[in-house]
């Protein structure tokens, strides 16, 4: 399955929540979902009550799009989470939060996860002093994530560093001047602001 390349604001309207796929625009009044909260192509709210399957599917799609993960990748993350100790849904979200592109975004080094993926792919990021250009790389407790020395004069990265205002989660620490951050520990569920009900995702895959 190819990565979605269409208008990302339509995805937010489809899921009925902000997925923060468009960077700064998502934090402004220009966000389309503020103006039109109905799904794209639909004129007026549907009166049909969604089935249990449809509700579970929507929740899975919402999480997948929130993190920009392909279908097969998402299935692998669920399989990984189901084999670990703990509550499967919470472990799934924790695993998604550990993705390098998500951590780069959470640290404020990118305006969106899509931009974070590009920054990682273009070899602007290092982990523990070593270049890592794989967005799906899973960070661990104690890892130091930083913008590479050779990339610090990159125009877009300098703009982001100068405008950084996003609140950094408690499980991360960031030195914005050094363009470096540390994974203090793995996140707890109440520290993950992903707007999904993970139990519905577990139910979807448990059918």
Curated annotation (Swiss-Prot):
InterPro entries: Ribosomal_uS4, Ribosomal_uS4_bac-type, Ribosomal_uS4_CS, Ribosomal_uS4_N, S4_RNA-bd, S4_RNA-bd_sf. GO terms for cellular component: small ribosomal subunit. Residues 98-161 form the S4 RNA-binding domain. One of its GO terms (biological process) is ribosomal small subunit biogenesis. SMART domains: Ribosomal_S4, S4. GO terms for molecular function: rRNA binding; structural constituent of ribosome. Gene3D superfamilies: Ribosomal Protein S4 Delta 41, Chain A, domain 1 (1.10.1050.10), RNA-binding S4 domain (3.10.290.10). NCBIfam families: PRK05327.1, rpsD_bact. One of the primary rRNA binding proteins, it binds directly to 16S rRNA where it nucleates assembly of the body of the 30S subunit. This is Small ribosomal subunit protein uS4A. The gene is rpsD1.
């Amino acid at each position: 399955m190819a990565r979605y390349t269409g208008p990302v604001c339509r995805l937010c309207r489809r899921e009925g929540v902000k997925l923060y796929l468009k960077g700064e625009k998502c934090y402004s009044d220009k966000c389309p979902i503020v103006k039109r909260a109905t799904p794209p192509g639909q004129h007026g709210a549907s009166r049909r009550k969604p089935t249990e399957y449809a509700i579970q599917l929507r929740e899975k799609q919402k999480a997948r799009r929130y993190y920009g993960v392909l279908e097969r990748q998402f299935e692998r993350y669920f399989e990984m989470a189901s084999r670990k100790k703990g509550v499967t849904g919470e472990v799934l979200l924790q695993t998604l939060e550990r993705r390098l592109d998500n951590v780069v975004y959470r640290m404020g080094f990118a305006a969106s996860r899509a931009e974070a993926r590009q920054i990682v792919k273009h070899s602007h990021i290092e982990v523990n002093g070593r270049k890592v250009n794989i967005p799906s790389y899973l960070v661990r407790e104690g890892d130091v994530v930083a913008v590479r020395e050779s990339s610090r004069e990159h125009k877009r990265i300098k703009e982001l560093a100068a405008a950084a205002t996003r609140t950094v989660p408690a499980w991360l620490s960031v030195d914005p001047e050094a363009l470096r951050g540390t994974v203090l520990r793995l996140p707890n569920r109440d520290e993950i602001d992903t707007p999904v009900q993970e139990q519905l995702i577990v139910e979807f895959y448990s059918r």
